[in-house]
UniProtKB/Swiss-Prot annotation:
It is found in: Cell inner membrane. The keyword Hydrolase does not apply. Pfam families: ThrE_2. This is Probable succinate transporter subunit YjjB. Keywords: Cell inner membrane, Cell membrane, Membrane, Transmembrane, Transmembrane helix, Transport. It comes from Yersinia pseudotuberculosis serotype I (strain IP32953). The chain crosses the membrane at residues 7-27, 54-74, 86-106, 128-148.
Length: 156
């Protein structure tokens, strides 16, 4: 790992902590838990960035990062006596696919304004599916640790 990758990782983590902290404040998270929301958002986004850097596609990296956010959030909730969603929901929001969704919607507007074009339709479908799979991976990954760690009966 070079210095440029470490610098990019640090920058990515700091810039991901800011919206995680902002959404935690919007969701009325207790003041004592705000720093943990920001840290968890930075950890999740930074780990996703590293997975993407080392060749994993963004959908799978988002799934793994959101599972990691869920597991860490459950552990911190036991330590800080709070519900896991206090930490996890605000931490996962910086990973939502805003650019893909925006590009898909712009393609829809251009198709309605300019008429059908195969290139615009391809851009729309590609970005819409990419955004949908990322959102699905985030929601599934955030819910799986709760299903695994709070299970009362044995798995078999």
């Amino acid at each position: 790992m070079g210095v440029s990758l470490l610098w990019a990782l640090l920058q990515d983590m700091v810039l991901a902590a800011i919206p995680a902290l902002g959404f935690a404040m919007v969701f009325n998270v207790p003041v004592r838990a705000l720093r943990y929301c920001a840290l968890l958002g930075a950890i999740g986004h930074g780990s996703r960035m590293l997975m993407i850097h080392f060749g994993m596609n963004i959908e799978l990296a988002s799934l793994v990062a959101s599972i990691m956010i869920g597991v860490i959030g459950i552990n911190w909730s036991r330590w800080l006596l709070a519900h896991p969603k206090v930490f996890t929901v605000a931490a996962v929001i910086p990973m939502f696919p805003g650019i893909s969704a925006y590009t898909a919607m712009i393609s829809v507007v251009e198709i309605s304004h300019l008429g059908y074009s195969e290139a615009l339709m391809s851009t729309m479908v590609t970005n819409f599916l990419k955004a949908s799979f990322i959102v699905g991976a985030l929601s599934i990954g955030l819910s799986l640790p709760g299903l695994w760690l709070y299970r009362k009966r044995p798995g078999v």
